[in-house]
Amino acid sequence: MASTSLCAANPSASQNLRKVSGFVENKTTQCSFSIESILGLEQKKDGAAVKPHRPWMDGCMHQLGDPHLQIPVVSYENSLFHANSNLMQEEKVLNCEKYFSVTVTERLSFKRELSWYRGRRPRTAFTRNQIEVLENVFKMNSYPGIDIREELARKLDLEEDRIQIWFQNRRAKLKRSHRESQFLMVKNNFTSSLLE
């Protein structure tokens, strides 16, 4: 309302206001960083969706001739989003799923390879005899030197680093059990003092 009274009082102000509003209405340029352009939802003048910039996909799509290796690009114009989806699109998706499905043994082998890649080795299963010998040595010395560990490795047919890890784990187990026994002792003393 204030602008109408201002425009009525000053004709040049109303003319300037019309120029500015006309400029804003006529301005149709869109920013390249708009939400629509980032999401790839921009429409060209003919109504077709603008292809989003995905150079990592473009290289794969052009180099691979096998249609099973091509990953379908999902867009809102895709018929899979509509109730009347065509069979060809469904067939492509099924082929893609079939190609990427793997058996249980393949998954396990891949998991082993992946864990190897991360630096993890398979777990060592110690025999009863090996554990008995290691426990006897641990009772005498919980921190054996390299010479004792190498001798044990030769006798038990194990790698020296496995023996070193066994002793580290055994010391951690002893420390944990010691802590738990102290906790139980304190707990028992506390409960008995409460009962008295």
From Swiss-Prot:
Residue stretches spanning the membrane: none
The Swiss-Prot or TrEMBL record marks DNA binding at 119-178
Task: Please provide one cellular component term from the Gene Ontology annotations of this protein.
Answer: nucleus
Example GO molecular function: DNA-binding transcription repressor activity, RNA polymerase II-specific
Keywords of the record, alphabetical order, are: Developmental protein, DNA-binding, Homeobox, Nucleus
| Subcellular location(s) of the protein | Nucleus
Q: Can you cite a GO biological process for this protein?
A: pituitary gland development
* Principal subcellular localisation of the protein: nucleus
InterPro entries, A to Z: HD, Hesx1, Homeobox_CS, Homeodomain-like_sf
Q: What does this protein do?
A: May be involved in the early patterning of the most anterior region of the main embryonic body axis.
Q: Which family does it belong to?
A: Belongs to the ANF homeobox family.
Record protein name field: Homeobox protein ANF-1
This chain's source organism reads Gallus gallus
